Design a protein with these regions (language model features):
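Mixed-charge interfacial surface used for oligomerization/domain docking
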Residues: 3, 10-27, 32-33, 86-89, ...
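A glycine-rich beta-strand to alpha-helix segment
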Residues: 81, 110-111
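A short helix->loop->beta-strand "cap" motif at the edges of active sites that frequently abuts
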Residues: 105-108
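Conserved beta-strand elements of the Class I
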Residues: 4-6, 78
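Class I S-adenosyl-L-methionine
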Residues: 33-102
Length: 242
């Protein structure tokens, strides 16, 4: 039996050694260019170009065909997506599941809405691999990963909200003021949507706030994954704080 793990690229995980795994591209777009989020993307160049871009930007989720291509010929597929409250990726994957199972009777696709992004998705992908390696059956894997998800939490910090302004999520004037005064936004996503919880000045206060919010959310030891965008120093400081 062939079993496969699939996710969209918001997991920031393009390969997974020891697992049959495929990442499906999300797309970041402006009026002049598209960036396909895969292992070939020059992230530094994209960040630089977006930092000086004045127009609107946005994202596009994988289409049904992209998901079907990723499912390939697997007998069982275990899939997770960015929060369905933030993107159409989850609904697209569900549509692909229905089509795949209808076209291939007997095959199964489990689609899990992470209700988060990035590190949370990585934790779920790792859990899928662990249970597949333990030769658990399909229903057990689905049930145990769903339960595992309930014990995860994502906390984020934004140094800049420029891109949120460019895609219309916040006012440009608000973004300019936040950047001018070095205000960092710290938040979580308890219901799958971005939920700002704190506004602080400077990186040091942001890191302290992240850890405080971890404890408030019930963290008392355990695995933590830290993603960052060209901020290794802050990631290491947070690691040492934890």
């Amino acid at each position: 039996m062939k079993r496969k793990i699939v996710s969209d690229s918001s997991a920031n995980m393009y390969n997974f050694e020891g697992a049959d795994y495929t990442s499906v591209d999300m797309i970041i777009s402006t009026d002049t260019k598209e960036y396909h989020d895969n292992e070939n993307l020059d992230v530094a160049q994209m960040v630089e170009e977006l930092s000086v871009y004045k127009g609107r930007s946005g994202t596009a989720c994988p289409g049904v065909g992209d998901w079907l291509e990723a499912f390939a010929d697997a007998d069982e597929v275990f899939c997770t997506t960015i929060s369905g409250e933030l993107s159409g990726s989850y609904n697209s994957a569900l549509a692909a599941k229905e089509q795949y199972e209808e076209t291939h009777p007997g095959r199964k696709v489990y689609v899990l809405d992470s209700r988060a992004t990035g590190p949370t998705m990585k934790l779920l992908i790792e859990k899928f691999k662990e249970l597949i390696s333990a030769d658990k059956d399909y229903d057990t894997i689905c049930r145990e990963v769903e339960d595992y998800k309930k014990h995860t939490c994502i906390i984020f910090s934004l140094e800049s909200v420029r891109n949120l302004a460019n895609n219309g999520r916040i006012n440009h004037a608000v973004a300019a003021i936040a950047n001018m005064f070095g205000i960092r936004i710290v938040g979580n996503a308890p219901e799958g949507t971005l939920n700002p919880t704190d506004k602080v000045r400077g990186e040091k206060k942001a890191i302290t706030c992240i850890y405080k919010n971890m404890k408030k959310s019930g963290y008392h030891g355990g695995r933590v994954l830290i993603d960052h965008c060209f901020n290794e120093g802050a990631a290491q400081t947070l690691k040492q704080t934890i």
